[in-house]
Amino acid sequence: MKGTYQSDNDFLLSAVQRGDQKAFDTLFRRYYPMLCAYGHRFVELEDAEEIVEDSLLWIWENRETLVIESSLNSYLFKMVYRLSLIHI
């Protein structure tokens, strides 16, 4: 059984995929600080912020065809990790 946090993220992702701008704003506010801090472990803070912004924008722009087989949380952190390594 999924926990409340995961269920909330599933609902949030579904809303984003339907084009709900408020849901995307919520996703952005929820994940931006954590993802920036995580990305900053690999690159300078300014670069981490840009990587996170690009990642979240990519989610929005590709929302209609986006398929996430893992959790949203895992997907976002892996995306930032990979983009940070490419940036190095």
Regions found by a protein language model. Name each.
Residues I86-I88:
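Conserved small/polar residues in nucleotide/adenosyl-binding loops
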Residues M1-S7, F11:
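Intrinsic, short, N-terminal disordered tails of RNA polymerase sigma-factor systems
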Residues E64-E69:
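Short alpha-helix-to-loop micro-motif enriched in aromatics/charged/Gly
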Residues L27-Y31, L35, V80:
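Hydrophobic/aromatic residues within well-ordered alpha-helical segments
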Residues E50-L57, S70-R82:
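Structural recognition of an alpha-helix C-terminal capping motif at a helix-to-coil junction
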Residues K2-G3, Q17-D25, C36-D54:
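Short, charged helix-capping/linker segments at alpha-helix termini
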Residues D10-Q17, L56, W60:
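Regular secondary-structure segments
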